[in-house]
């Protein structure tokens, strides 16, 4: 279930495809003949259908009727995706007790397609050598992808993604953090990119990180989502800067921290502007009522397209 990513990363490799992608259907190429019409089906097909007729009107009528029948039998399905962000504090709750089952239940009950996780230990002494992301992946039956931010306590500490769909590829991008090194984890899926980060407590580093993330998003031809613990309130200058590049999908009026009695919102889910945003609609957005499993409450957004 684990997909480790490279320790460092610079330039993203070129994307294979752009926009929202779906399995490509076979093209129908029509070529006129003297006494009728020839239809060649391609790619991957050697079948040729010859229709002999006096004119093209009958052929066009039959083609339209066949298309209408196909769409009636196999209508185009709109997509829907549920995104989450959760600072899990390494599976440790407000009671100071580490309980992976409790954390996993909070996630599983929401039935997300993809989850951005922050504050994950991997093989540290304080976690008894256990891998927090792997523990949660096993309990939620989701695929886990991890990115180290720092070496810590005999292991590492970082961020991760849980997803129903196995990522096509992933990338680890170091971000500035003078008090603690930060990281961006990018995962490409069939229809979109989904990313997670946990930004610095230093405003200058946060602003620099936002500019870096926006530059990376601009290179991606698919819709680009990013979620995480930004350590920033909605009225902060870096969040205002973020809004220049990204659309805020989650509700900043709903508080996320501290989990017991939330007083501020510092956890967000965003979508990069200009990446087919007109096709996406927010169906649901809320902060999940989870006061005990971590010191943050998780954020959930469901989008349709």
Task: Annotate the PLM regions.
Residues 4-6, 13-17, 42-45, 50, ...:
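Intrinsically disordered, low-complexity segments enriched in serine/proline and basic residues
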């Amino acid at each position: 279930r684990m997909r480790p990513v490279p320790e460092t990363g610079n330039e993203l490799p070129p994307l294979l495809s752009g926009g929202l992608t779906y399995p490509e259907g076979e093209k129908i190429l029509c070529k006129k003949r003297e006494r009728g019409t020839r239809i060649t089906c391609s790619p991957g097909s050697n079948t040729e259908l010859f229709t002999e007729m006096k004119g093209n009107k009958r052929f066009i009528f039959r083609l339209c009727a066949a298309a209408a029948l196909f769409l009636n039998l196999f209508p185009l399905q709109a997509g829907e995706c549920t995104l989450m962000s959760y600072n899990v504090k390494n599976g440790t709750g407000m009671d100071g007790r580490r309980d992976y089952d409790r954390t996993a239940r909070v996630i599983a009950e929401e039935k997300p397609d993809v989850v951005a996780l922050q504050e994950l230990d991997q093989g540290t002494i304080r976690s008894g050598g256990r891998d927090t992301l792997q523990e949660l992946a096993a309990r939620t039956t989701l695929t886990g992808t991890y990115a180290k931010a720092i070496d810590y306590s005999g292991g590492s500490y970082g961020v991760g993604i849980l997803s129903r769909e196995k990522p096509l590829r992933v990338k680890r991008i170091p971000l500035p953090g003078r008090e603690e090194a930060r990281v961006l984890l990018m995962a490409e899926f069939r229809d979109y990119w989904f990313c997670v980060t946990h930004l610095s407590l230093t405003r200058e580093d946060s602003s620099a990180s936002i500019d870096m993330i926006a530059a990376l998003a601009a290179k991606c031809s698919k819709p680009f989502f990013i979620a995480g613990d930004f350590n920033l309130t909605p009225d902060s200058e870096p969040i205002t800067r973020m809004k220049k590049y990204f659309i805020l999908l989650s509700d900043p009026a709903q508080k996320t921290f501290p989990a017991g009695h939330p007083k501020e919102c510092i956890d967000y889910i965003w979508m990069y502007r200009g990446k087919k945003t007109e096709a996406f609609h927010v169906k649901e957005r809320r902060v999940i009522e989870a006061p005990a499993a971590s010191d943050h409450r998780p954020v959930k957004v469901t989008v349709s397209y």
